[in-house]
């Protein structure tokens, strides 16, 4: 690790939720809560940056009583501290139709996020009646997953990541956590150099790369660890709190 504490001036901590802030019971540990509160008390902004939609993360986000922004659906949406929408970028319905056809071709598990619902199992008849944020495939079989990935990559208008080794997450091209964070830092009056970003999956790589300090969880996918400046403990060992204490407090 080449970065030292004296090399960075952290004004904002960006934290992924699943596999990062949350333990395997989907809870925020007392240690993580305490470190986040101490960082905010010190004047450092804390921003949750998640692949989840607002409806699936709001309760957890509210419990932290953060003073800044919230990034959801891998950067498709930015919310202020009162959960008012600041910005939203949608997936084109043609792309949703293509991915739904691909899902049916391979008979995979899926989920798809609109602005007011997460679809699982069922799917709307009229795709154009909805505003789409993200489409996800969950595929245990490596061969099928790679085949789906290959077909998706033919379309150059998609941002393709994952939030676990067995899934694929798709947003509109250019929509990622880093792009959303850059907009947040601009609103707050500093740059990505002043950000510490923490995560565990491919949908965290962009923000980990572009942040002044990129932190991978101990349980992160290998490619995420290779990208990071620093590797903390796992999500079940208060890795978030330990990184905050090491770099900020």
Swiss-Prot record:
It catalyses: 5-amino-6-(5-phospho-D-ribitylamino)uracil + H2O = 5-amino-6-(D-ribitylamino)uracil + phosphate. GO terms for molecular function: 5-amino-6-(5-phosphoribitylamino)uracil phosphatase activity; magnesium ion binding; phosphatase activity. One of its GO terms (cellular component) is cytosol. Mg(2+) binds at residues 16, 18, 200-201. Phosphate binds at residues 17, 50-51, 177, 203. CDD domains: HAD_Pase. The active site is at 16 (nucleophile). One of its GO terms (biological process) is riboflavin biosynthetic process. Pathway: Cofactor biosynthesis; riboflavin biosynthesis; 5-amino-6-(D-ribitylamino)uracil from GTP: step 4/4. The keyword Ion transport does not apply. It is an enzyme of class 3 (hydrolase). PROSITE patterns: COF_1, COF_2. Keywords: Hydrolase, Magnesium, Metal-binding, Riboflavin biosynthesis. Its cofactor is Mg(2+). Transmembrane segments: none annotated. Its EC number is 3.1.3.104. Disruption phenotype: No visible phenotype during normal growth or under oxidative stress caused by diamide. Belongs to the HAD-like hydrolase superfamily. Cof family. Catalyzes the dephosphorylation of the riboflavin precursor 5-amino-6-(5-phospho-D-ribitylamino)uracil and of flavin mononucleotide (FMN) in vitro. To a lesser extent, may also catalyze the dephosphorylation of a broad range of substrates such as phosphorylated sugars and triphosphate nucleotides in vitro. This is 5-amino-6-(5-phospho-D-ribitylamino)uracil phosphatase YcsE. It comes from Bacillus subtilis (strain 168). The lineage of its organism: Bacteria, Bacillati, Bacillota, Bacilli, Bacillales.
């Amino acid at each position: 690790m080449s970065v030292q504490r004296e090399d960075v001036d952290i004004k904002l901590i960006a934290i992924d939720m699943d596999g990062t802030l949350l333990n395997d019971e989907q809870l925020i540990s007392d240690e993580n809560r305490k470190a986040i509160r101490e960082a905010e008390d010190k004047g450092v902004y804390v921003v949750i940056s998640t692949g989840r939609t607002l409806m699936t993360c709001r309760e957890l986000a509210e419990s932290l009583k953060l003073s800044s922004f919230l990034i959801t659906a891998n950067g498709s949406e930015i919310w202020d501290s009162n959960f008012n929408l600041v910005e939203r970028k949608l997936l084109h319905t043609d792309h949703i139709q293509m991915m739904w056809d691909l899902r049916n071709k391979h008979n995979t598990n899926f989920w798809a996020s609109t602005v007011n619902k997460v679809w699982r199992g069922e799917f709307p008849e009229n795709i154009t009646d909805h505003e789409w944020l993200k489409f996800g495939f969950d595929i245990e079989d490596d061969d099928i997953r790679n085949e789906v990935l290959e077909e998706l990559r033919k379309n150059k208008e998609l941002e393709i990541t994952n939030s676990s080794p067995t899934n694929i997450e798709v947003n509109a091209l250019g929509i990622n956590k880093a792009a959303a964070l850059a907009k947040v830092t601009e609103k707050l009056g500093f740059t990505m150099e002043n950000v510490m970003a923490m995560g565990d999956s491919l949908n965290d790589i962009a923000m980990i790369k572009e942040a002044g300090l990129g932190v991978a969880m101990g349980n992160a996918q290998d490619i995420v660890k290779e990208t990071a400046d620093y590797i903390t403990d796992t999500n079940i060992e208060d890795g978030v709190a330990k990184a905050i204490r090491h770099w900020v407090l």
